[in-house]
Amino acid sequence: MDIIKKNKKIIILVCLMFLAIMVYIYKSNGPDKTNDNILEVKITIKDHKFVPNIVEVPKSTKIRLIIHNADDTIEEFESHDLHREKIVMPHESINIILAPLKPGKYEIFGDFHQDTAQGFIIVND
């Protein structure tokens, strides 16, 4: 008990630091208030092709790409234009969040089947 009295200020300081860290973690990883305004775009990989292979979205919109691989083989979703590259295991899905994009045409492709897995995300004005 004597140790607690002597170190009371240190204990309070440590508790306050712990509380500050917990608040920071919550704010960093907490619920995203902008999720209400996120546009979900679903693309399926089927027979080594993107379905649909052209997707149109409005400008200034946060996008969640949901890529589902319906094939029996692995694929790598890739886009140099979007600076994204992600493995999609057979019969699984991945999510890719995109910040609002400027109007334009963004190429996407399957790195393991580049001759067939091709497409575009078109951002309209």
UniProtKB/Swiss-Prot annotation:
Main location: membrane
Cellular component, GO, one term: membrane
Location relative to the cell: Membrane
CDD domains referenced in this protein's UniProt entry, alphabetically: Cupredoxin_like_3 (cd04203)
Keywords: Membrane, Transmembrane, Transmembrane helix
Transmembrane spans: 10-26
Signal peptide (residue range): none
Cross-referenced InterPro entries: Cupredoxin, EfeO_Cupredoxin
Membrane-related topology note: Single-pass membrane protein
Protein name per its UniProtKB record: Uncharacterized protein RP394
